[in-house]
Amino acid sequence: PTGGVNGQNIGEFIAAPFIHAVGGSWVCPKADIAAGNFEKITELCKQARSAALGFEVAHIGLNCEDAEAASAVCEKLNEAFALTVKDGNSSMFASGGIEVMKSMYLGKNGHIAIRTNSVPLAIAELAKKGFVCDMTTAKYKGGRMVAVYLKDEIGGFAVHLLQK
C-alpha cells in the first residue's frame, strides 16, 4: 500500500504478514524533489526505514544452570521488586522484561531480545551493516519467521530478533 501510509503507521502496515512493501509520497515530497533538497529526502527515508523496522528491546535473558537456579533468581527478583513470576517450559519470566533460562543457553551472559515489525526486513537491514543471522536458530509460526539469533554475540550476549 501507498495510500494512507505515514511515519506514524508504517510499522503497523509492515508488521502485517500479507504486506511485503509499503510506500508513500510523504517520504519524497514534490517540493523537496523540485528544490533538490535531497538531504531532507534522505533523512525522511532513514526515518521511514527506522519506523518500518520498529526496533525495541523486548526482554533480557539470563542463563542459569538449571530450573532450580532459575527459580532462585526469579524469587530474588520478586522479593526485591515484586515482579510477577511466570513459569514456562524452558524459562521463567520475572515481569515481561526478564527471561531467566532453566539451562545455559546461547550467549556467554545470556541474551537480549529485540522486537521488530518484520524479522525478514530486519535481517536484510542488519546484513547491510555487516551483521549476520544464524538461520539454524530461526523459529517459524504459520510459515512466517518469528525469531532468529544473530551469529555473533554483543558484549557477551546473544541477540535475537522477535516478530511483534
What are these regions (language model features)?
Residues 61-99, 121-128, 139-146:
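Core segments of cupin and vicinal oxygen chelate
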Residues 108-136:
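Mid-chain, well-packed structural core segment of small domains
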Residues 27, 36, 55, 92-102, ...:
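Vicinal oxygen chelate
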Residues 3-9, 18-41:
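Glycine-rich phosphate-binding active-site loops on the catalytic face of alpha/beta enzymes
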Residues 13, 48:
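Conserved, mostly hydrophobic/aromatic
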Residues 41, 45, 70, 119:
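Aromatic/hydrophobic pocket-lining residues that form the small-molecule binding cavity
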Residues 50-74, 107-114:
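N-terminal beta-strand motif that seeds the catalytic metal site of vicinal oxygen chelate
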Residues 15-19, 54, 106:
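Alpha-helix termination/capping residues and helix-transition junctions
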